[in-house]
């Protein structure tokens, strides 16, 4: 048999107005119907003396059948991570430019996973192999197969997420764009548009003028998002007066 990483719950998950320079870097990791490893992978660099070229030594995590291909032009210079990644977010070929601190070993530069669902299928296969369950067919992601080819499904295990207040805590405290986008898609049952409508309906029912906000995503990474100061003030006032909203929201602030 084979393992299928089913990512079909979400529709297109990269908001249309995210810029090309963001969608390959760690903060631009888009949601997936089957997210895994926070939809990011690490390139482990070794840097030398100031001005020398840094080299990629390893990747974590790795796929079982597909290898990353990284065109790297990273210089050992400065005191901070100033490396940036470009390329097709769904491709295993990446371009990395910029600089990282000199004289480092296993220095981590993060980028977006090309296919989180396939990696999840790979890692599940590895775990099954370790306990003696052997699979003789290559893994797939549901993006590449027709749903009709899956004849039947049997629920074998359910894993529950942390409660919503804990997810919100991490989202706000760490400014986690991936979590914010995933929450929006969950509200919209896989659709960015329907998620935005759900947010607007929530505040409209509480008396706010939703014509004062224009949302294109859940995190604010897109540059077209706009909100008036009046809407923000009224929203915070509503949260403050609602004990169910105020406690988890206030706890989540840095």
Locate predicted features:
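Polar, glycine-rich mid-to-C-terminal structural blocks
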Residues: 1-79
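Short, intrinsically disordered, charge-balanced linker/junction segments flanking boundaries
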Residues: 252-254
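A small/polar active-site loop signature that marks catalytic segments
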Residues: 75-250
């Amino acid at each position: 048999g084979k393992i299928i990483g089913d990512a079909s719950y979400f529709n297109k998950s990269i908001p249309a107005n995210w810029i090309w320079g963001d969608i390959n870097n760690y903060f631009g990791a888009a949601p997936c119907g089957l997210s895994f490893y926070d939809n990011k992978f690490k390139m482990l660099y070794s840097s030398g003396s100031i001005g020398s070229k840094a080299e990629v030594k390893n990747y974590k995590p790795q796929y079982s059948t597909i290898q990353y291909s990284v065109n790297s032009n990273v210089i050992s210079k400065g005191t901070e991570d100033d490396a940036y990644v470009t390329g097709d977010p769904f491709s295993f070929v990446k371009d990395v430019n910029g600089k990282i601190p000199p004289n480092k070993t296993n220095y981590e530069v993060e980028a977006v996973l090309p296919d989180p669902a396939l990696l999840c299928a790979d890692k599940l296969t590895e775990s099954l192999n370790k306990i003696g369950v052997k699979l003789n067919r290559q893994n797939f992601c549901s993006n590449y197969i027709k749903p009709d080819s899956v004849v039947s499904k049997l629920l074998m295990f359910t894993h529950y997420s942390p409660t919503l207040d804990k997810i919100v805590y991490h989202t706000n405290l760490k400014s986690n764009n991936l979590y914010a986008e995933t929450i929006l898609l969950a509200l919209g049952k896989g659709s960015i548009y329907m998620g935005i409508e759900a947010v607007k309906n929530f505040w409209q029912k509480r008396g706010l003028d939703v014509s004062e906000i224009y949302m294109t995503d859940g995190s604010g990474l897109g540059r077209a998002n706009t909100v008036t100061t009046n809407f923000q003030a009224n929203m915070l006032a509503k949260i403050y007066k609602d004990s169910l909203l105020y406690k988890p929201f206030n706890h989540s602030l840095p």
